[in-house]
UniProtKB/Swiss-Prot annotation:
The keyword DNA damage does not apply. Homodimer. CDD domains: GST_C_Ure2p (cd10293), GST_N_Ure2p_like (cd03048). Disulfide bonds: none annotated. It comes from Kluyveromyces marxianus (Yeast). Plays an important role in the cellular response to the nitrogen source. URE2 gene plays a major part in the repression of GLN1 and GDH2 genes by glutamine, and is required for the inactivation of glutamine synthetase. URE2 gene product may catalytically inactivate GLN3 in response to an increase in the intracellular concentration of glutamine. GO terms for molecular function: transcription corepressor activity. This is Protein URE2. Pfam families: GST_C, GST_N.
Length: 404
């Protein structure tokens, strides 16, 4: 019995030991699996670290590349700035050189003008001794302050009985403007070109007929020596008198509406066209200092004035073409130009009506000097150029501009 119990205890012990060993083996098996998982996790971690490292390297390379591009761009910008600065410096140097050349030209022109005036003085006053060392500018100044009115006084002491006497100056466009009208009307007139260097324009006898002491001035000897000053007033007096005496509105009109338009253009020329060109010439050649803003301002204003005239003449030409070539008027109005109309491009057109008037002729002398302020009317204002060319071909205009 005891022996059986002993044997049974032994079997239980063995059974428990086997179970324990089995559990140990199972535990070892689980432990092996965990270690395998740990190895896999470690490998993945290494792989991730390598990926991260590669990403960092790529990012660093990208940053370096971007930095290089920025550096290249900065260098290009610096080079461009340097180039712009060099160009600006070159432009400034060129402008300075141009200004110096213009100043030299102005000085030469002033010297030539002074020499011319001095030469005239010596010819007209050979016995007038000038002290040594006196500059030409001082002599010109003295001549401007002194008045030699002997020639003017002699004229007024023995005036003509008929015709007209025009007081003008060799370089006065407004004087030639009046001469052109007198010549076109075939009126008998004599011209006295005043010598400003002698102060003839300030002679008491001349100031009596023109209190402004400028040219032109006109004496109508047929009307009890009536004196008229200001070019526009002189022109209107002459054309109206001619119309009343002959009944022919030559250079004028018998239509009141056209007369108003002629007056408008005549006043536009005397108040806007002539003064702007005169000021542009003054600041470009004769002003004591170079004032670019003044030169530009008056030159631009002259261009604006010519733009007004150009538009008016272009409208007159369009009306002429549509009237003379009625068959193609619709095509021309639509913006096309048939070959049949090309022959009309050189036809003369006028500011008022279908004939030349004093409104047109008043522009001629000033149009002849506008190139001296850098305006090429042939290129910039083709209608003005053709208009001026037609007037310059007229025999009366040629005669007047020659001072005959």
């Amino acid at each position: 019995m005891q022996q059986d119990m002993h044997n049974g205890g032994t079997g239980n012990t063995i059974s428990n030991l086997s179970s324990a060993l089995r559990q140990v083996n199972l535990g070892n098996s689980n432990t092996t699996t965990d270690q395998s998982n740990i190895a896999i996790d470690f490998n993945q971690q290494q792989l991730m670290e390598e990926v991260n490292q590669n990403s960092m390297n790529a990012f660093n390379i990208q940053q370096q590349h971007q930095q290089q591009q920025e550096n290249v761009q900065k260098q290009q910008e610096q080079q461009q700035q340097q180039l712009q600065q060099q160009q600006q410096q070159q432009q400034q140097q060129q402008q300075q050189q141009q200004q110096q050349q213009q100043q030299q030209q102005q000085l030469q022109q002033q010297q030539q003008l002074q020499q011319h005036h001095h030469h005239q003085q010596r010819q007209q006053h050979p016995n007038n001794n000038v002290q040594a060392g006196t500059s030409q500018q001082q002599m010109l100044f003295q001549g401007a302050n002194s008045i030699d009115s002997s020639r003017i006084t002699k004229f007024f002491q023995n005036q003509p009985m008929e015709g007209y006497t025009l007081f003008s100056h060799r370089s006065a466009p407004n004087g030639f403007k009046v001469a052109i009208v007198l010549s076109e009307l075939n009126m008998h007139y004599n011209t006295i070109f005043l010598d400003f260097n002698l102060g003839e324009h300030r002679a008491p006898e001349f100031v009596a007929i023109n209190p402004n002491a400028r040219v032109p001035a006109l004496i109508d000897h047929n009307m009890d020596n009536l004196s008229i000053w200001e070019s526009g007033a002189i022109i209107l007096h002459v054309v109206n008198k001619y119309y009343r005496e002959t009944g022919t509105p030559l250079l004028w009109s018998d239509n009141l509406a056209d007369q108003a338009q002629i007056n408008a253009w005549l006043f536009f020329q005397t108040s806007g066209h002539a003064p702007m060109i005169g000021q542009a010439l003054h600041f470009r050649y004769f002003h004591s200092q170079k004032v670019k803003s003044a030169v530009d301002r008056y030159t631009d204003e002259v261009r604006r004035v010519y733009g007004v005239v150009e538009m008016a003449l272009a409208e007159r030409r369009e009306a002429l073409i549509m009237d003379l070539d009625s068959e193609n008027a619709a095509a021309y109005s639509a913006g096309t130009t048939p070959l049949s109309q090309s022959r009309f491009f050189d036809y003369p057109v006028w500011l008022v009506g279908d004939k030349i008037t004093v409104a047109d002729l008043s522009f001629v002398p000033w149009n002849n000097v506008v190139d001296r302020i850098g305006i090429n009317i042939k290129v910039e204002f083709p209608e003005v150029y053709k208009w001026t060319k037609h007037m310059m071909r007229r025999p009366a205009v040629i005669k007047a501009l020659r001072g005959e």
